[in-house]
Amino acid sequence: MKDEVDEITIFYKYRAKIKLFGSKFVENNKHLCTIEFDGKQLNLQEYIILSNEQISRLYHSIITIKLKGISKITNIEHMFSNCRNLLNVTNIDNWNTNKIINMNSLFRECESLKCLPHKLDWNTSKVTDMSYMFFRCISLSSLPNISNWETKNVTNMSYMFDDCKLIQSLPDISNWNTENVINMKSLFFGCEKLLSLPDISNWDLRNATNIGLMFDNCWSIKYLPDISKWNIEKVTNINCLFFDCSSLLSLPNISKWNVSNCKDMSEVFKYCNTLSYLPDISKWNVSNPSNLEEMFYSCSSLLSLPDISKWDMSKVNKINGMFSSCKSLTSLPDISKWNISNVSNIENLFDSCSSLLSLPDISKWDMSKVNKINGMFSSCKSLTSLPDISKWNISNVSNIENLFDSCSSLLSLPDISKWDMSKVNKINGM
C-alpha cells in the first residue's frame, strides 16, 4: 500500500536561514518518514547527517515539504521547535494524528510564526504530552480552534501557551478533560495581552501536583474565571500562581482551597498591585510549606490582609520579603505568636511598608536559625517605634545590612547592645 503523503506548505522569513525540523523529531522518526523538497527526496537519516548550512545551500528556495508516512508516526515532539524564521504552516489542519502520543514542543519558539490554520481538526485521544506546544510563539496573534481536542490522556500541559505575547483570547478550552493532568505549570504564563480566559472553572484538577506560575504575567486580565471549586489537594506547588497579574481587580474566593500538600507558596500574589483585598485565606493549612517568601510582595494597593495570625509556620524556612512593598497597609495581622523556629531567612520582611503605623509584638520570635535579617524594617517610613527586639538571638545571623535604613520617623531604637554579632559580616547601611 502506498505511503500516505501529507503536504505542509511553509514560508520562511529568511530563505538563507532555513531550519526545517527540531532535532528530536528527526531522531525519533528517521526510519518512518521521508521528506520531499519540491520533488527532491531526502530521508530523515540523511537529514541529520547534513549540517543546517548544507541544507540551506541545497534547498534555499524550499516552500513545500511533503512528509510521507506521517500516519505511522507516534511522536511529533519538537517537530518545528526553534524554527525561528518559519512564517506560516498550512495543510496540517486535517493531519492523521491517530497514533500520536507526544506533541511536546511542537511549535516551540517559532518566534516568527504568524499564522496557523484556523482549526486543527486532530485526533488527540492518545496524546499524553502537550507541554510547550505553543511556547514562545511570540508573533502569533491568534491560535487555531482546538476546543474539541480530546485531552483525557494528557498528563502534561505545562508551558503550553507560555509567552504567547500577542494573543488576546484563547480558543474555548473550557470543556477539556483535565482529570489526568499532573503538570499545569506556567500554562498561561506571559500571555501579556490576554484580556480574559475561557471558563475553566469546571476543570478537574484532582491529579494535578503543579500549578505554579499558571497565570503569571497575565498583565491584562482584570478578572479570572471562578476557580474557587478547583480540587487542588494533591498540588505541591502554587508559587507565583498570580504573579504580576497587575490588572486584577479581584480574585475568586479561593478561601476553601485545600493547600495542605503545598510545599512552595512563594510569590503567590506578588505584584498584584491593583488588588485592594484578598480572599480570606486565614484558614489555609500552611503546615507543610517550607517557602512563603515574597508571598504578598508589592501588593501595593492592599488595604488589609486576611487574619493569618494562626497559620502554623513551624515548618517554614523562608519568609523573606513576605510583606515587602505593601505600601498601603497601615497595620498587619497579629503575627506575634508565629512559630518561626525553622526560618532561616527573614530579610526585607517589612521592607517599604511605608504606611505601617505599628508592628505586631514580634519580640519573642525564635530567631535561633535565622541567618539573614538585612533590610527587615527598611523604608518603614511611618513607624515611630519598633517592638522590643533586644532579646532576639541573632547568633547565626551573618547579614544585617540596611536593617533600619530609611526608617525616617523612628524616635528611638530598641536596646540592641547585647546582640551576639559574632557571625555578622555585613552591617553596612544598618
Give, region by region, the residue ranges found by the protein language model.
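Short acidic, glycine-rich loop/turn motifs
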Residues: 36-39, 56, 107, 242, ...
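Leucine-biased recognition of intrinsically disordered, low-complexity hydrophobic segments
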Residues: 166, 195, 205, 213, ...
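Extracellular beta-strand/beta-solenoid scaffold signature
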Residues: 117-119, 144, 171-172, 198-201, ...
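Short, solvent-exposed linear patches
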Residues: 68-77, 94-105, 121-132, 148-159, ...
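Canonical position 11/12 of the leucine-rich repeat
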Residues: 84-88, 111-114, 138-142, 165-169, ...
